[in-house]
Amino acid sequence: MSSNSPSLETDVDDVENIVFQFQNSSLDFQSSDDFSILGIDQPHPIVRIGGMFFRGTWHQPIGTDIVVPSVNDSELSRDGLVLCKRRLMLEQIRLVPKNPSPSSSIHSPTQGEPENISEN
């Protein structure tokens, strides 16, 4: 490898762990392998897990979140711990067409119901 070629080791510095905190949602992650994030660098990213959509809001916790894997105490080691400096609070939303047909109705969400967001 020549001295002018980029090093792959620099990509390691760009890794950031993020805690996702879901509000008003009962989501079974075990059955939701299909996952994507739109606008991760924006103030309100959109997260899709399976067929459900969530609108995120970034929060900076005081200190650092420590995520501990669900394992037996005897198996716990420092290698399994994850440190996170940012938290993404997620609220479930419902996407609606920008120009809905007259037959469809859009209503305001009630407490615990997903917010309607127009598709761009």
Curated annotation (Swiss-Prot):
Protein name, as recorded: Transcription factor tau subunit sfc7
Organism domain of life: Eukaryota
InterPro entries found in the cross-reference section: TFIIIC_triple_barrel (IPR019481)
Source organism of the structure: Schizosaccharomyces pombe (strain 972 / ATCC 24843)
Composition skew (Polar residues), residue ranges: 101-120
GO biological process terms on file: transcription by RNA polymerase III; transcription initiation at RNA polymerase III promoter
Oligomer and partners: Component of the TFIIIC complex including sfc1, sfc3, sfc4, sfc6 and sfc7. The subunits are organized in two globular domains, tauA and tauB, connected by a proteolysis-sensitive and flexible linker.
One GO molecular-function entry: RNA polymerase III cis-regulatory region sequence-specific DNA binding
Any one Gene Ontology cellular component term annotated for this protein: transcription factor TFIIIC complex
Location of the region described as Disordered in the Swiss-Prot/TrEMBL record: 96-120
UniProt keyword annotations, A-Z: DNA-binding, Nucleus, Transcription, Transcription regulation
